[in-house]
C-alpha cells in the first residue's frame, strides 16, 4: 500500500511496483541478514512472472528488492528500489525508540542500564541523526516529517534520557511479569 502511494509521485510501472512490494521480504524465510538477496532470487525464479515482464523489467525488480535494506551503503539503483526502500521503513519515533531498547536488552543482556543507554544513544546517532546511515529516498514520504521529529528528540539530551528510562523500565519488567 505504501509503495503504491509513493509511486504516484513518479512515472513508473504500477505492476512492477506492486510485484516488488509483494516479493521484497519473502527471503525472510531464510533469516534477516541476507533476506534482500534471497527475496530477489525468489522473484527471479518465479516462472510465471517471466510471462508478464520483460527481461529488463525482471532484472530491475530483482535489483530493487536487493537494494531495499536500510543498512545498504549505496543508494538504490533505480526509482523502484527507492520506492520499496522508503515504503519498507516506517519511522515512528516511539516505535523506533522502543525497538532500540528491546534490541539492546535481548542482544546484550549482560549490559547494565548505563551501558544500555550508551548503546541506545550510539545506535540512534549512527542511524537516525543528521549524517546517519539511514537515508530517505522519497522527499514526499511521511517518513521525512517523522525523521525530523525523531532527530529533534535525539538532540534533546534531557528528554531522550527520560524516554529511555521509561522504556527501559517497561521493557525490563515485561519478562518478569510473563514469568509469574
Give residue spans per PLM region:
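Alpha-helical phosphate/pyrophosphate-handling elements in metalloenzyme active cores
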Residues: 1-16, 38, 43-51
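Divalent metal-dependent phosphate-bond-processing catalytic cores, especially two-metal-ion Mg2+/Mn2+ enzymes
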Residues: 1-12, 23, 72-180
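Detector for methionine-enriched segments
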Residues: 4, 16, 58-61, 111
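Amphipathic alpha-helical interaction surfaces
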Residues: 5, 9, 29-32, 45, ...
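His-Asp-centered metal-binding catalytic motifs of divalent-metal-dependent phosphohydrolases/nucleases
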Residues: 13-31, 35-39, 60-70
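Helix-adjacent hinge/juxtasegments
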Residues: 37-79
Amino acid at each position: 500500500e505504501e509503495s503504491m502511494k509513493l509511486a504516484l509521485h513518479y512515472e513508473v510501472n504500477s505492476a512492477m511496483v506492486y510485484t516488488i512490494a509483494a516479493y521484497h521480504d519473502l527471503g525472510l524465510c531464510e533469516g534477516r541478514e541476507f533476506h534482500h538477496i534471497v527475496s530477489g532470487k525468489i522473484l527471479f525464479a518465479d516462472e510465471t512472472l517471466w510471462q508478464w515482464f520483460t527481461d529488463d523489467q525482471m532484472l530491475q525488480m530483482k535489483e530493487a528488492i536487493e537494494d531495499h535494506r536500510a543498512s545498504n551503503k549505496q543508494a538504490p539503483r533505480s526509482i523502484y528500489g527507492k520506492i520499496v526502500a522508503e515504503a519498507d521503513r516506517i519511522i515512528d519515533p516511539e516505535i523506533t525508540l522502543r525497538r532500540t531498547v528491546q534490541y539492546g536488552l535481548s542482544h546484550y543482556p549482560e549490559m547494565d542500564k548505563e551501558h544500555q543507554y550508551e548503546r541506545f544513544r550510539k545506535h540512534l546517532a549512527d542511524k537516525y541523526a543528521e549524517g546517519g546511515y539511514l537515508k530517505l529516498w522519497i522527499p514526499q514520504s511521511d517518513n521525512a516529517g517523522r525523521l525530523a521529529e525523531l532527530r529533534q528528540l535525539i538532540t534533546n539530551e534531557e528528554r531522550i534520557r527520560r524516554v529511555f528510562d521509561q522504556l527501559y523500565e517497561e521493557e525490563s519488567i515485561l519478562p518478569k511479569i510473563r514469568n509469574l
